[in-house]
Amino acid sequence: MNLGVYVKTKCRICFGGHRYDTSSSDTFAPTVNFCTVLIMICLSAMFSWYLGSVDYSQAYLNAELDEICIMQAPASVREYDETNQEYFWLLKKAIYGHPKSSRLWAACLHRKLIEMGYEQFLTDQCVYGKWKNWDTTNIHGQNVPENMSFVCIPTNPFG
């Protein structure tokens, strides 16, 4: 028995029929830093800005796939041709449960925010800002795995 010796081991577990390979490193998704959330809370308190959250409905379904993805249909809707060969589905967009869907949604949201004139912060890759002057500042922080975004703006958009 070796007392005081720590042995570190790694285990890579993949589920849903997916095998770990080199492309599995693309399954990450960026998350906003907790300190950044605290800074957004402080800014909104100091300047009486509105701080709210945005939940994107069915967000992952808006992201385009970056590779060909074929899926077996669920048992309740499977169809067969005349030679008893099963039909498969060719996916055009990401779906929930796809290993890369959160990363693809993060890339899609990044493109849309840049198109809308936001600039990505250098200190946190999940935070985008848009400002002309101090009264029209708009800060957007994205937290992809939870599919939640934080918005910090000078006025309450709801009145």
What is each of the regions a protein language model found here?
Residues 1-159:
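Long, low-complexity, charge-biased intrinsically disordered regions
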